[in-house]
């Protein structure tokens, strides 16, 4: 499934426009449509997300 750059920004909690900029710099895998617009494959975006196990997340919040 293809997703918009704005959806990637929201999913990764990035400022709007960051995914599009990274794609244009060839630093993020993307698909360039015939009209020049950029889309991302949702499975590739999900692969960028690192899941932190809950027991580690609890340790990170301790002073």
Show where each model-derived region lies:
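Glycine-centered, phosphate/nucleic-acid-interacting loop/turn motifs that mediate DNA/RNA or nucleotide
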Residues: 26
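Short Lys/Arg-enriched helix C-cap and helix-to-coil transition segments
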Residues: 31-38
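Polyanion-binding surface elements
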Residues: 1-22, 51
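A short, Lys/Arg-enriched interface patch at domain edges and termini
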Residues: 43-63
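Short amphipathic alpha-helical segments
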Residues: 4-5, 38-40
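Structural signal for short hydrophobic segments within the conserved structured cores
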Residues: 1, 29-31
């Amino acid at each position: 499934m293809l997703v918009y750059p704005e959806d990637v920004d929201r999913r990764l909690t990035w400022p709007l426009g960051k995914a599009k900029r990274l794609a244009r710099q060839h630093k993020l895998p993307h698909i360039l449509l015939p009209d020049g617009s950029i889309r991302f494959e949702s499975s590739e975006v999900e692969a960028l997300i690192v899941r932190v196990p809950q027991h580690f997340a609890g340790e990170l919040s301790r002073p």
